[in-house]
Amino acid sequence: MIIDVHVHVFEEKMWSKKFLDGVYEVKRKTLTPEQFEKYSLEATPDMLIRDMDAAGVDVSVCLPIDFAFMTRQEPEISIWKANEYVAEAQAKFPDRLIGFVGVDPQRPDAIELLEKGIKDWGLKGVKIFPGMFYPTDERVQHFFRKANEFDLPILFHQGSDPHPFLIKYGNPIYLDELSLKYPNVKAIAAHTARGWNDLLAELMVFRVDKIWTDISGLQYEYTSSKWHFFTNLRYFIDRVPNAILMGSDWPFVKNPPQPSHKEWIQILRDLSLPKVFLDMGMQQFSDEEKNKILGNNAQKLLGL
């Protein structure tokens, strides 16, 4: 079973104007005119299922993103409706899609939305984007106390952040305290906490069955620095082979020069260290290791 633990489904009106303007400004500079003409911040469940079928992905975890409270500009479609949209996607494709609650824990009604999502809509976890707060801040502990009661995975964006968010809040060191303070919280550090990869791996060694990571975003390393891609992935497998989860960050990471969704899955299926790494004494990726990344680890974590 191939499981992608990091995808997003949304309509454009679920993003604030400030966010949309920023995205389109960046894309206008980085995409060709032909690519920009086709670019859209629209990623429906049906579009996702088509890409999953083409790539051979069996199950994807859909993560709502709540930027709006931090940027003080709410989108036309509220975060409540964005979460309900994910719940409806899960209901429409119950064997293919798993929905998480996505909410900024600083919101006054964050716990209300969490309870609605888990109890009434049947969502299976939580997505947190700590772009302007530390997960250990006292003002959000009431949220994590409630989340701890549900005994569900919480996926945290980790590592570098887009403007206007601050990278310091994505340091995985703060997951260490949370993992000890809330014994039922299963923390997933997204993107191998890019920028803090070694620190995250060290934390995971000492917090087995408490902290996991997903490899969404490593597509950038694959295209820009094969050296970093292979050494980073090999290092995590050597240290925490049962805690690495496959992620794609669909639909955000699929435009050239990054591999498409289908190409990314194929890269991981065919994962093979070039000879230069083997000559240095590094171990070749085994079929067992590749299968753990592609889905076996996620299957155990999610109870599938």
Task: Locate predicted features.
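Conserved, mostly hydrophobic/aromatic
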Residues: H6, M52, V86, G99, ...
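An N-terminally biased module of ancient metal coordination in phosphate/nucleic-acid-related enzymes
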Residues: M1-I77
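Distinct, well-ordered alpha-helical segments
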Residues: P108-I118, D137-F143, P164-K181, G195-F206, ...
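H/E-rich (His + Asp/Glu) clusters that bind or coordinate divalent metals
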Residues: K186, A193-L304
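Short, well-ordered coil/turn segments that N-cap beta-strands
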Residues: M1, G56-V59, F93-I98, D120-G125, ...
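Histidine-centered catalytic micro-motifs
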Residues: I2-E12, I154-G159, A189-T192
